[in-house]
């Protein structure tokens, strides 16, 4: 009996345990479902949190950009207010000058009117005085009246002429001063407009994109080249397109020609956005960040320019380095002052950093090298021309010596011929003159001096032989 109760009790306990187990399993399933829902909610919460963080970061960036643009707008507004103040001051000065000009013109017109009235009154008084004088001295001789009137009116006429000249000189001087003042005001307005345009261009260039900054750098580079004395198209060329292969070309900003066929390339596409932030920022932390970005921009441009390898371009006999031009002098100085090792880093990439001042010194040196080269070439040409001239003179001297020898030979032949003609025994002149003594008639005789000298040296044997010949009938009478 007790065993049956024990077994029944065990069955009851087993059923209770099974029920408890089922309840526990149901509780576990419920807890697992709850856990899954909680995990899903947790993942959704994390996703929402990440979205919120992203939105927060985007909003923070927008706030920073908004603050940056607000600062830029404030700076531009300050510049605009300053420019407006300058314009207002200049307009006030212009109004003041205009008022002074108007007052001067009115005063001049009043002076002119008073002078005309005075001249008219003086003329009337002179006429009345002349009339009274003529009336009082009407019975005097006309010549005496005329002389007296001239003596009386001549000083007054001279005074009037001098007064008129002074008035004319005063008007002329005032007109010239008015013209000069107007010209200076116009120049002041033009200078103000030019300064405003240049300031606006510089601001746009520093705040613009890389293309705009590159164009600004090329403008500054062109001014430095112009100041150096080099000539475009002769000692330097701009925007030369160099063909590398069938599909690619490179176009350096400037190629400067050196003596002896060498070249040097100048690049002017430096970005100065970070330097603009450094220059305009008033916060030291922002200035430090902008300065580091400026240095990083310099290093990046050095590496990019080194990869272009301009000094190895085909058709160029370039030096082993390229000049990297930084168009704003303070941007160059602040970088070198902060990190002097930038110069050595650039040289390792075959790059030499230059500012407007250092580039101008280098270009002036190149100008002097070209001047010396031209002088050397001129000296070489002079030496070549001198050598050719010396050869010409030598040939001329040789020809003159040959001509002298020919003249000496001709003179010797002349003397020999003259000796045969009029000197010595049996000379021709003496023989033909003997024909005259024999009665031969001639139209014109030979020169008496030559004939006398020839006859004196002529031997009488010739005459005897000639007489014998005559007796023999060779020369009949």
From Swiss-Prot:
Biological processes annotated in GO: DNA recombination
Keywords: Coiled coil, DNA recombination
Residues making up the signal peptide according to the UniProt record: none
The UniProt record lists the keyword Coiled coil: yes
Coiled coil feature spans: 1-211
Positions of region (Disordered): 458-477
Protein origin, superkingdom: Bacteria
PANTHER family, per the entry: DNA RECOMBINATION PROTEIN RMUC
Task of the protein: Involved in DNA recombination.
Family of the protein in this entry: Belongs to the RmuC family.
Protein name, UniProt field: DNA recombination protein RmuC homolog
């Amino acid at each position: 009996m007790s065993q049956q109760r024990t077994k029944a009790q065990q069955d009851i306990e087993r059923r209770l345990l099974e029920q408890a187990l089922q309840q526990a399993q149901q509780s576990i399933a419920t807890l697992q479902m709850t856990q899954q829902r909680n995990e899903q909610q947790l993942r959704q919460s994390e996703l929402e949190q990440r979205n919120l963080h992203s939105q927060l970061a985007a909003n923070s960036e927008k706030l920073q950009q908004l603050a940056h643009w607000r600062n830029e707008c404030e700076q531009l507004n300050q510049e605009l207010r300053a420019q407006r103040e300058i314009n207002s001051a200049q307009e006030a000065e212009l109004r003041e000058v205009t008022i002074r000009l108007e007052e001067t013109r009115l005063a001049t017109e009043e002076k002119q009117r008073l002078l005309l009235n005075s001249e008219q009154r003086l003329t009337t008084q002179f006429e009345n005085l002349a009339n009274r004088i003529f009336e009082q001295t009407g019975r005097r001789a006309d010549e005496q009246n005329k002389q007296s009137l001239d003596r009386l009116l001549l000083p007054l006429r001279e005074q009037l002429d001098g007064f008129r000249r002074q008035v004319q000189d005063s008007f002329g001087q005032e007109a010239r001063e008015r013209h000069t003042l107007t010209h200076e005001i116009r120049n002041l307005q033009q200078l103000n407009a030019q300064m405003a345009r240049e300031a606006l261009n510089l601001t746009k260039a520093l705040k613009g994109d890389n293309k705009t900054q590159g164009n600004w750098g090329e403008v500054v580079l062109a001014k430095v080249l112009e100041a150096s004395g080099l000539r475009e198209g002769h000692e330097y060329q701009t925007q030369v397109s160099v063909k590398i292969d069938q599909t690619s070309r490179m176009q350096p900003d400037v190629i400067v020609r050196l003596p002896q066929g060498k070249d040097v390339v100048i690049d002017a596409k430096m970005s100065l956005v970070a330097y603009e932030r450094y220059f305009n920022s008033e916060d030291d932390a922002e200035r430090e960040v902008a300065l580091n970005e400026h240095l990083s921009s310099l290093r990046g441009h050095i590496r990019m320019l080194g990869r272009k390898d301009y000094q190895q371009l085909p058709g160029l006999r370039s030096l082993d380095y390229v000049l990297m031009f930084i168009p704003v002098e303070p941007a160059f100085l602040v970088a070198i002052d902060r990190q002097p090792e930038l110069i050595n880093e650039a040289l390792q990439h075959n790059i030499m950093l230059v500012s407007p001042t250092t580039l101008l010194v280098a270009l002036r040196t190149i100008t002097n090298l070209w001047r010396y080269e031209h002088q050397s070439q001129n000296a070489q040409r002079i030496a070549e021309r001198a050598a050719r001239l010396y050869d010409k003179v030598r040939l001329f001297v040789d020809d003159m010596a040959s001509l002298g020898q020919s003249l000496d030979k001709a003179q010797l032949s002349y003397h020999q011929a003259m000796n045969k003609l009029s000197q010595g025994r049996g000379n021709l002149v003496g023989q033909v003159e003997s024909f005259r003594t024999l009665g031969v008639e001639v139209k014109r005789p030979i020169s008496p001096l030559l004939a006398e000298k020839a006859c004196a040296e002529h031997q009488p044997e010739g005459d005897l032989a000639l007489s014998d010949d005559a007796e023999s009938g060779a020369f009949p009478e």
